[in-house]
Design a protein with these regions (language model features):
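Amphipathic alpha-helical dimerization/coiled-coil segments
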Residues: 1-3, 10, 14, 32, ...
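N-terminal helix-turn-helix DNA-binding core of bacterial DNA-binding proteins
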Residues: 6-55, 76-77, 82, 90, ...
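Basic, gly/Ser/Thr/Pro-rich low-complexity segments located predominantly at protein N termini
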Residues: 28-29, 42, 58, 72, ...
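Generic structural signal for secondary-structure transition and capping sites
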Residues: 27, 39, 65-68, 101-104, ...
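Basic amphipathic alpha-helical segments that dock to polyanions
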Residues: 56, 60-66
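Beta-hairpin "wing" of winged helix-turn-helix
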Residues: 64-84
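Intrinsic disorder/low-complexity segments enriched in polar/small residues
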Residues: 5, 60, 83-85
């Protein structure tokens, strides 16, 4: 089932679809941190930065609903849950790398101006 925000964006243009899927708080940082492979919730939270467990959970659920992230629950005691990029999610790697480079360039230019 497609989320309402994505359905609405589909009526506008592809850029709006990308923003609807990836524009949430911390979503691109989550994707960036899953590029290296599967990760458990706690570790992902530490890698992402100052994000609350509630927000991280919500963003992971939306990314899962949009087919970008998969969630695997292992039948172990204690339970183990891992998140990883789906095949579709992996297609974001070049875009995320480009945005990461752009962000670093932008940040250095702001620093130079101050």
């Amino acid at each position: 089932m497609t989320r309402k925000a994505v359905e609405t964006a589909m009526q506008v243009c592809p850029v709006e679809i990308a923003v609807a899927v990836l524009g949430g708080a911390w979503k691109l940082t989550i994707v960036k941190n899953l590029i290296d492979g599967p990760c458990r919730f706690g570790e992902l939270g530490r890698r992402v930065g100052p994000v609350s467990a509630r927000v991280l959970t919500r963003q992971l659920r939306e990314l899962e609903a949009d087919g970008i992230v998969s969630r695997t629950v292992f039948a172990e005691v204690p339970p183990r849950v891992e998140y990883e990029l789906t095949e579709l999610g992996r297609t974001l790697e070049p875009a995320v790398a480009w945005l990461d480079d752009w962000g670093a360039t932008y940040s250095s230019r702001l620093t130079e101006r101050s």
